[in-house]
């Protein structure tokens, strides 16, 4: 009877250890560097400082307004890009 309790305890401890390792690996993946992304257009009211705040809220280090050249029917626009 005592050996079966010991075996169950060892199995439970092993399962908890494995699940903690899996959780730490999953958490490590979620905090890896995010790929660059571009968000809203930069305007007279939304410029580099606002863009930087916007990107920081999305867990990026910084954000800048970058000029995007559109296809011939479109004009060039400033876009807030995070990196």
UniProtKB/Swiss-Prot annotation:
Domain of life from the UniProt record: Eukaryota
Subcellular location: Secreted
InterPro entries xrefs: Defensin-like_dom
Keyword Ribonucleoprotein: no
Main location: secreted
Key words, A-Z: Antimicrobial, Disulfide bond, Fungicide, Plant defense, Secreted, Signal
Cystine connections: 38-82, 42-65, 51-80, 55-81
GO biological process: defense response to fungus; killing of cells of another organism
Signal peptide: 1-24
A cellular component annotation (GO) from this entry: extracellular region
Family stated for the protein in its record: Belongs to the DEFL family.
Protein name: Putative defensin-like protein 67
Organism whose genome encodes this protein: Arabidopsis thaliana (Mouse-ear cress)
Lineage: Eukaryota, Viridiplantae, Streptophyta, Embryophyta, Tracheophyta
């Amino acid at each position: 009877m005592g050996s079966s309790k010991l075996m169950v305890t060892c199995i439970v401890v092993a399962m908890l250890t494995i699940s903690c390792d899996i959780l730490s690996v999953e958490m490590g993946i979620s905090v890896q560097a995010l790929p660059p992304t571009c968000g809203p257009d930069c305007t007279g009211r939304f410029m580099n400082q606002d863009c930087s705040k916007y990107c920081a809220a999305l867990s990026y280090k910084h954000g800048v307004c970058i000029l995007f050249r559109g296809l011939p029917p479109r004009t060039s626009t400033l876009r807030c890009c995070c990196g």
